[in-house]
Amino acid sequence: MNRMSVFLAIWVVSAEAGFAQKVNPLRDSLRVAADSLAYHPDRIDLRLKKASWNIQLEEWNYAKEEYDRVLSKDADNPTALYFRAYVNEKLSRYNFARLDYQHLLYIVPGNFEAQLGLALLNEKDKHFTEAFDGINRLIAQHPDSAVAYAARANMERERKMYEPAEYDYTEALKRVPNNQDYRLSRAYVRIQLRKKEAALSDLDYLVGLGVSKVALKEFYDKLKK
C-alpha cells in the first residue's frame, strides 16, 4: 500500500489550505531578511534566518547557498551543518549530507538530531546495516525517546519486519499515547500480522481522538477480509 496514504491524505487537505495562507507572510519575512543582509552581509545570524525562510518555502538551493556562506566563515557552526545536511538530503546529495552530519557529530558528540538524521539518511541511501546500527545506538542513549523508537519502527516496517515494528511502535506510544501517526502505523503493522482485534483497537482509538472514520475506511475494510 502507499505509505501512510490515508493519514497523509488527511494532512494534505489541511496543509494545502494552510500553505496558501502562509506563503505571502513567508515571502515577506524572506524579503526582510534579504534586505537586512544587503546592509549587513557578514551577519551570520541574518544568513541563518534567511536560510530558514528558504527552507520553509522549499527553496533548497537558495538555502544551501546561505549555509555554504555561513560555513565558509564558521566551519563548525552546528546550526548551519545540521540544516545543510537536511537540505543536501532534499537535493539527493546524500554523500554531502552524510559528511555534514558526521562533522556535526565530531564537534558535538552524541547530538540527538544529528544521529537521528544520519540514521535516516543511511536508511534512505540503502546503507541498511549502518542505519540500524545508528538507530539502535540512539535508542540505547535515549531510551525515553518516542521519536527514536518510532524511527526504528519505520525502518522495520519498510523492511517488512512487522513484529519488531509493532514492538517499537508500542514503545513509542507508551511515551506519547495520542500520537496519531504512530498509532495508525501500528494499526497497519497489526493488520499485516493479522492481529485484527488489536488493529481495530488502534483504529477506534484514533476515532476517539477525532480522526474521521471515513478517512480510516481503507483500514477498517481490511479488517473485514
Please annotate each region the language model reported:
Residues 55, 82-89, 123, 150-157, ...:
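Position-specific recognition of the canonical hydrophobic site in helix A of tetratricopeptide repeat
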Residues 24-28, 192-225:
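Terminal, low-structured helical/coil segments at or just beyond the last alpha-helical repeat
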Residues 44-45, 78-79, 112-113, 146-147, ...:
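Helix-start (N-cap) detector for alpha-helical repeat units in TPR-like alpha-solenoids
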Residues 36, 69-70, 103-104, 137-138, ...:
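Canonical positions in the second alpha-helix
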Residues 39-40, 73, 107-108, 141, ...:
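Structural marker of alpha-solenoid helical repeat scaffolds
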